[in-house]
């Protein structure tokens, strides 16, 4: 049997009732999951802090950790905003999940992650993505079609794009790595199983090339 690590997505959004997450959390715990992933879709800071605190409390009831990811076009857009959220809520099961694509787009560097207290981090989403027209992985326009398309259906295998995956991984503690790599073109070419195998194979090769054990 393959164990389950995390479930998603426990979002904070004004039109969603977070109480509806409770049955999913209960089932996740039954399946042996340890983590829940969430994201914030409002810029109302007081509101999302309150909601995150309640979700973290709900997750704790089932022995789950709640991990919030930052995305440049979401309510919590970068690492510093995510740190502020965790520091404000003060829940002992609340963490930041770093997605290497979103972090790269937000301008997060390996050096910045290395300077950050490792207590904030719990797991990583691993993937690559193309640079913008100027060759920079950071895209300033949050409505940029490349940003949205890549995130939803065009992520690249590690080493194919412009993200400093090695720098980010080396800048964080030794925590679980979860490959999140939706790519409809690759799935069409290779099939679901073939794409999954390519994800794992390229990640292993990338880590070996960059001296990551």
Across the structure, where does each feature detected by a protein language model lie?
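Histidine-acidic metal/acid-base catalytic patches
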Residues: 27-32, 57, 79-98, 104-213
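Active-site acidic/histidine proton-transfer and metal-coordination neighborhood
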Residues: 3-96, 105, 191, 210-213
């Amino acid at each position: 049997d393959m164990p389950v690590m995390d479930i998603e997505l426990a979002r904070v959004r004004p039109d969603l009732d977070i109480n509806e997450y409770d049955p999913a959390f209960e089932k996740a715990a039954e399946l042996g999951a340890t983590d829940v992933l969430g994201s914030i879709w409002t810029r109302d800071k007081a509101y999302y802090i309150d909601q995150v605190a309640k979700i973290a409390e709900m997750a704790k009831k089932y022995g789950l950790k709640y991990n919030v990811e930052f995305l440049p076009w979401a309510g919590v857009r970068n690492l510093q905003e995510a740190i502020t959220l965790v520091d404000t809520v003060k829940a002992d099961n609340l963490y930041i999940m770093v997605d290497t694509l979103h972090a790269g787009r937000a301008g997060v560097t390996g050096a910045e992650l290395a300077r950050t207290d490792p207590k904030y981090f719990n797991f990583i989403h691993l993937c690559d993505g193309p640079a913008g027209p100027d060759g920079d992985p950071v895209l300033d326009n949050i409505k940029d079609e490349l940003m949205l398309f890549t995130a939803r259906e065009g992520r690249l295998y590690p080493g194919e794009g412009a993200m400093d995956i090695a720098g980010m991984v080396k800048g964080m503690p030794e925590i679980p790595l979860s490959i999140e790599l939706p790519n409809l073109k690759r799935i069409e070419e290779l099939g679901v199983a073939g794409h999954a195998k390519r994800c794992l194979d390229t990640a292993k090769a990338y880590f070996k090339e960059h001296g990551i054990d």
